[in-house]
Amino acid sequence: MRHAFRHSVRTLGLLGLLPVLSACNSLAQMSEIGRPPRMTSITDPTLANSYRPVTMPMPPLQAPPDEAASLWRSGSKAFFKDQRASQVGDLVTIIVDITDNAAFNNGTTADRTADEKFGIPNLFGIKGKVISAITGADSLSTASSSDSGATGKITRNETVTLRLAGTITQVLPNGNFVVMGKQEVRVNSELRELGVSGIVRPQDITADNTVTHDRMAEARISYGGRGTLTQLQTPRYGQQVMDAILPF
């Protein structure tokens, strides 16, 4: 009873928010009438409300041994300066080339038939009178059959290819880099937003200062947009709410 009451209150609350959401959406659309979508300003990604520092399991830190009269600095990669990204704020080019193909085709068929018959000629001297009175015969028989079949098929084909520059926002204690990249491209009245973030090993950054997406751990890749086309392809708030609460 209490669960049903809470569900009713939640439904009424969502319905009450429909006019507010519709008004906010209308105001946002009216503010962009005759103008393309506004591009966001360049800001520090670590100052965003959604930014969270990355923490990962790390090995214990060990102090480097002192080497007297050595020409090599501890942790150096080469005698000459390495031009690859290595510090917070350095840029690195991220290459995303995703080509996924998946196909599943499953089929299940089950068929079972059972038939049993047995008689009771003498039941404690009654000689089957009880059975014959119930079934009209001196024996019992049972029969059952079941048949079921199911098929399922899934086919997916996705391709994403892009290049964008990212920034090292964090250097983890084990030396790995947290890289974040964002790019906005506006074409007519549609704004495309590209975003990539993940953890990269320094040795996976090539000599031309690039790294591929398959070398990024915990990679998060987003490709979306906003504008006239996105508004036409997105269901209205009322339709989304009704799809969420209607059971049929």
From Swiss-Prot:
Lipidation sites (N-palmitoyl cysteine): C24
Keyword Calcium belongs to the record: no
Key words of the record: Bacterial flagellum, Cell outer membrane, Lipoprotein, Membrane, Palmitate, Signal
Signal peptide annotation: 1-23
GO biological process, one term: bacterial-type flagellum-dependent cell motility
Localization, UniProt: Cell outer membrane; Bacterial flagellum basal body
Molecular functions (GO terms): cytoskeletal motor activity
Residues linked to a lipid group, S-diacylglycerol cysteine type: C24
Membrane topology field: Lipid-anchor
GO cellular component term of the entry, any: bacterial-type flagellum basal body, distal rod, L ring
Cited PROSITE patterns: PROKAR_LIPOPROTEIN (PS51257)
Pfam family, one: FlgH
Keyword Flavoprotein among record annotations: no
Domain of life: Bacteria
Major localization class: membrane
InterPro entries: Flag_Lring
UniProt record similarity statement: Belongs to the FlgH family.
Function: Assembles around the rod to form the L-ring and probably protects the motor/basal body from shearing forces during rotation.
Subunit structure, interactors included: The basal body constitutes a major portion of the flagellar organelle and consists of four rings (L,P,S, and M) mounted on a central rod.
PANTHER family per record: FLAGELLAR L-RING PROTEIN
Protein name, entry field: Flagellar L-ring protein
Organism from which the protein derives: Gluconobacter oxydans (strain 621H)
Lineage: Bacteria, Pseudomonadati, Pseudomonadota, Alphaproteobacteria, Acetobacterales
